[in-house]
């Protein structure tokens, strides 16, 4: 029994075998339960440092009262000398050895031994612990022990394998071997950071093995290998691939941002273009509208200018009738010049006979058309005999009141009665008119009024007077104002058939009446008047005649002229007709009779709507038996002076003919 204990304590299997050798052999084949227990084979393990290892020791059959013991490199592992990371667990029929966080010191030979009443058995295994990322020596061949005895050989093969191992050693010995770290003195065997191990074998001397790093190889790790280059290249590839991926991602992000920015730019540019287009269209529309408005304004201005010009032309010329019918006579408004001729010029040149052309008002300018007989001669057969018999005829203009509306009076054309030169000095003042002078009523070719050549019409002839006029040019009393009427040949030109009628301005007429007491010389005794006088224009007596007018004219005051026989003839046109009234008064030449006649004529002028032809001597020239009562409204005169008999004969001839339609 002492030998068995020693054998257990030493852990040697030979003694066990020796002790069991004395038993009879037939016991092996006996199936009785008296046979000793048998352990299953344990496998050797190789593991990296820090890993967990488990060694199991099992019996092939179940036995009761079994005891297990573990040994490391021949030393029993108990509670005293057992490392902290090794634990032993006992279970029924088996035992386990657990190594937690294995290290290089845990490598070695481990043996399990079972003890029972029937017998003992043991099994062993090698454990190799290497550092991480290193290929360490392995034990690919397992050590087989079957009924281990001192006579049976045990073969252990140790080899180092790996891709970068510096050496591989295999030994075949009779006994067991294991790797142990070299001592401090022996560590210098391996160079370049190699790890030194010693292989201990019972029969052979120890040998050194080197565990080399990746960059070196050889028995002593003396050879340099570019192993780290591959690792670094991989790392570099990874490092380069990552930035590439990042760059790709960044480029994709940039592209997306660029696309968004491009789209935004396109949208902004499109919006700007649309806005500019809209603004341009608005500008074009506004320009067109303003242009149209300007054109309208220009057209209106032109129209107004044209209307003003036409008004001025109508004022100056009246309506144009280039070829008037022979039966119509056109009375045109008197031309008003912008440059008003001074009263002095008018007074100095008013010694000639003036023929009134139109009736002037202060508000309107209109023309009146009168009928004309188809005769183209100044006198027919009857009138020629009368004119030849008459030495002097007193005729006065009946449209002196037309000068009342114009303050200064327009310039007048002159026609020399004896074929002398015409005085056209006043044309200087009419050049600033809108139209040329040849279209004005003062021109020679334009006639403001026409009288029928076949019929003689008495016209008032009066001589204007002014303070500057010499006494020889002073107009005498009306009774002595006679002018010789030489026969005038008919001109082949229509323009010359229309003599220009001159009108005495109202202011000068008033002056003439003021200076009437001073005018004592007779007209036929004044040689200046006879040399410069006009041939008398036959103005017909307007009696009970119809006229046409566009609008009613304002009333014009008509002064009354004194006659030597103290007869005042008042001719009015109430309700568009001309009514002649002849009032016979006593012979008086006082100023009171003048004023009364002027006031009465002013009342009559207010009632006159249109051209009032006032001939104070016409009443004295008319004879009651010669008048046709159906065509005249004149009152017959009671008595006639001897000087008026000739004029009465003339008026009787004129009255027999058709009246002028005013």
Swiss-Prot record:
Compositionally biased spans, kind Basic residues: 564-574
- Quaternary structure and interacting proteins, as annotated: The cytoplasmic domain interacts with the LIM domain region of LIMK1. Forms a ternary complex with ERBB3 and ITGAV:ITGB3 or ITGA6:ITGB4. Interacts with NRDC and BACE1.
Enumerate the glycosylated residues.
Answer: 120, 126, 164
An example Gene Ontology molecular-function term? transcription coregulator activity
Q: Cytoplasmic side: which ranges? A: 289-662
Question: What ranges does the record list as Basic and acidic residues composition bias?
Answer: 425-445
Domain text from the record?
Answer: The cytoplasmic domain may be involved in the regulation of trafficking and proteolytic processing. Regulation of the proteolytic processing involves initial intracellular domain dimerization.
- PANTHER family of this UniProt entry? HEREGULIN-NEUREGULIN FAMILY MEMBER, PRO-NEUREGULIN-1, MEMBRANE-BOUND ISOFORM
Q: Where in the body, by tissue, does this protein show up? A: Widely expressed. Most tissues contain isoform alpha2A and isoform alpha2B. Isoform Alpha2 and isoform beta2 are the predominant forms in mesenchymal and non-neuronal organs. Isoform Beta1 is enriched in brain and spinal cord, but not in muscle and heart. Isoform Alpha2C is highly expressed in spinal cord, moderately in lung, brain, ovary, and stomach, in low amounts in the kidney, skin and heart and not detected in the liver, spleen, and placenta.
Which residue ranges does the record annotate as region Disordered? 1-52, 358-383, 398-480, 547-610
Q: Name the propeptide positions.
A: 1-13
Task: For this UniProt record, give its keywords in alphabetical order, as a comma-separated list.
Answer: Cell membrane, Disulfide bond, EGF-like domain, Glycoprotein, Growth factor, Immunoglobulin domain, Membrane, Secreted, Transmembrane, Transmembrane helix
Ig-like C2-type domain location: 37-128
The reply on keyword Secreted is: yes
Biological process GO terms, please?
activation of protein kinase B activity; brain development; cardiac conduction system development; cardiac muscle cell apoptotic process; cardiac muscle cell differentiation; cardiac muscle cell myoblast differentiation; cardiac muscle tissue development; cell differentiation
Residue stretches making up the EGF-like domain: 178-222
In its UniProt entry, what is this protein called? Answer: Pro-neuregulin-1, membrane-bound isoform
> Where does the secretion signal sit in this chain?
none
Recorded GO CC terms: axon; cytoplasm; dendrite; extracellular space; GABA-ergic synapse; glutamatergic synapse; membrane; mossy fiber rosette
Task: Describe the PTM.
Answer: Proteolytic cleavage close to the plasma membrane on the external face leads to the release of the soluble growth factor form. N- and O-glycosylated. Extensive glycosylation precedes the proteolytic cleavage.
List membrane-spanning regions.
266-288
Query: What is this protein for, i.e. what is its function?
Result: Direct ligand for ERBB3 and ERBB4 tyrosine kinase receptors. Concomitantly recruits ERBB1 and ERBB2 coreceptors, resulting in ligand-stimulated tyrosine phosphorylation and activation of the ERBB receptors.
UniProt feature, compositional bias: Gly residues:
410-420
* Positions with biased composition (Polar residues): 374-383
Listed as disulfide-bonded, the cysteine pairs are 57-112, 182-196, 190-210, 212-221
| The family this protein is said to belong to | Belongs to the neuregulin family.
**Source species:** Rattus norvegicus
